[in-house]
Regions:
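Multi-pass alpha-helical transporter architecture, strongest
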Residues: 197-203, 401-421
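C-terminal transmembrane helical hairpin of 12-TM major facilitator-type secondary transporters
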Residues: 301-344
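Cytoplasmic helix-loop-helix junction between adjacent transmembrane helices
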Residues: 125-164
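Juxtamembrane intracellular "pre-TM" segments in multi-pass secondary transporters
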Residues: 15-25, 205-242
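A membrane-interface helix-boundary motif in multi-pass transporters
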Residues: 178-191, 381-406
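Helix-to-loop junctions at the C-terminal end of transmembrane segments
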Residues: 82-94, 286-300
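Conserved MFS/SLC helix-loop-helix module at the cytosolic interface between two early adjacent transmembrane helices
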Residues: 80-119
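Short amphipathic helix-loop junctions that connect adjacent transmembrane helices
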Residues: 48-65, 255-272
Length: 421
């Protein structure tokens, strides 16, 4: 099979698209499907992994929660360490081989987890998953490669919607498979990842031309070196800081949403699940359909700030809502937070060259990993501090209000950083 006039090899280059006035729609579609399938394979195991850990521990729920938390921390740590490496590798060898090998690695890793005879093997599989999942940063670099700068906000919005679609579908499919056998979702995730690798091998073209590639150097590939890129431009550092605060604020949802909704409103797992699914669907609609027209109407800078302020308002509604109805009314407001991420990505990709896009996305992913390490402890401890008997002020919504503060600070930093852009 020939793509762009050449054979479908692991490192086949395509003509760089930034000289054209329109993004390479086919290439964007390919990478968006890849993102959906990646997130689908990731989300499939969510409903069953804690239960499988508990089974290995003989039903000890408390110890299982501790081990599961360590698994999550290990996954985030691997993201922090390995995302810059994969980003630098993609700058050197191209995006295509990194994406395909990561998908292949994920597929084999899920098979390992499906066959895991002990908790140690399951833990090792989770660590490997964190390494292989670092290809998400390469997907962001691919989008930057194949999309002209003035189209990137919409393209990153579609990428965010693809993340959301895969993440909404994944747990639902995993729950159905897990009802039959707790190991079936791992086989489903393996099949999805391996099929994705096959799909990409035949249809995914390379996006980074040979002449725009950069040598691989460890000073670029290690987290500290990758983060130094963010300090190379004042605007870039400010935007990266705002993006970090966005990711940190988002950590309140997986950390305390279930605890908060159960504590304050008496909701069970099904009600919480439907609510979180509604949040994901609304955000997906905004990122998939509204980023382009809103950006065209408001401009890129105002779209970014509007998204951050909507997120801050949504979290404030969540934290102060006296009734479940008021809480649910915050969901559509929160959905417009989805404007901020694509806009921030668009601004940041404009500040670096084509040969640095992988390094940039790796640095962003490393910051996301740091947020993933900090968030669970920060928000659960805040929640405990404001509902415990020692609390001077009983405020269950304190974690959400903390996220509101983080986004307001992020909005101020982003406004200042984009003044000269």
């Amino acid at each position: 099979m020939r793509l762009e006039g050449g054979p479908a090899t692991m490192a086949h280059p395509m003509t760089h698209p930034e000289s054209s006035t329109q993004p390479r729609q086919a290439a964007v579609f390919f990478i968006l499907v890849t993102v959906v399938l990646d997130m689908l394979s990731f989300g499939i195991i969510i409903p069953v992994l804690p239960k499988l850990v508990e089974e290995f521990l003989g039903g000890d729920t408390a110890q299982a929660a501790e081990i599961y938390g360590l698994m999550g921390t290990s996954w985030a740590l691997m993201q922090f360490v390995c995302s810059p490496i994969q980003g630098a590798l993609s700058d050197r060898f191209g995006r295509r081989p990194v994406v395909l090998l990561s998908n292949l690695g994920l597929g084999l890793d899920f098979i390992l987890m499906a066959l895991a005879p002990s908790l140690a093997w399951l833990f090792a599989g989770r660590v490997i998953s964190g390494i292989a999942s670092s290809s998400f940063s390469t997907a962001g670099a691919y989008i930057a490669d194949v999309t002209p700068p003035d189209k990137r906000a919409a393209a990153f919005g579609m990428m965010g919607a693809s993340f959301g679609l895969g993440f909404v579908l994944g747990p639902a499919v995993g729950g159905l498979l897990g009802a039959v056998d707790p190991r079936w979702p791992f086989w489903g995730a393996a099949a999805t990842s391996l099929l994705n690798a096959c799909y990409g091998f035949f249809v995914l073209p390379e996006s980074l031309p040979m002449e725009k590639r950069a040598p691989f150097r460890w000073k670029r590939a290690n987290p500290a070196g990758a983060l130094m890129l963010l300090r190379s431009h004042h605007e870039l550092f400010g935007l990266a800081t705002a993006n970090f605060l966005m990711n940190l604020a988002h950590g309140v949802l997986p950390s305390v949403a279930v605890l908060y909704l159960g504590y304050r409103y008496g909701w069970g797992p099904s009600a919480v699940g439907f609510t979180l699914a509604a949040v994901g669907v609304c955000a997906m609609i905004v990122q998939g359909t509204l980023v382009r027209p809103i950006t065209a109407r408001l401009g890129e800078r105002r779209t970014l700030i509007t998204g951050l302020l909507c997120g801050a308002t949504g979290f404030a509604i969540y934290g102060l809502a006296p009734t479940p109805l008021i809480y649910c009314l915050g969901i559509p407001v929160m959905a417009f937070w989805g404007l901020a991420g694509p806009s921030a990505q668009m601004f940041m990709t404009r500040r670096v060259s084509a040969s640095e896009q992988g390094q940039l996305q790796g640095a962003i992913a490393s910051l996301t990993g740091i947020a993933g390490l900090i968030g669970p402890t920060l928000f659960t401890q805040t929640f405990a501090a404001f509902i415990g008997p020692q609390a001077d002020w009983h405020l269950p919504g304190a974690p959400y209000l903390l996220s509101t503060l983080l986004l307001l600070i992020g909005a101020g930093i982003a406004w200042r950083a984009t003044r000269a852009v």
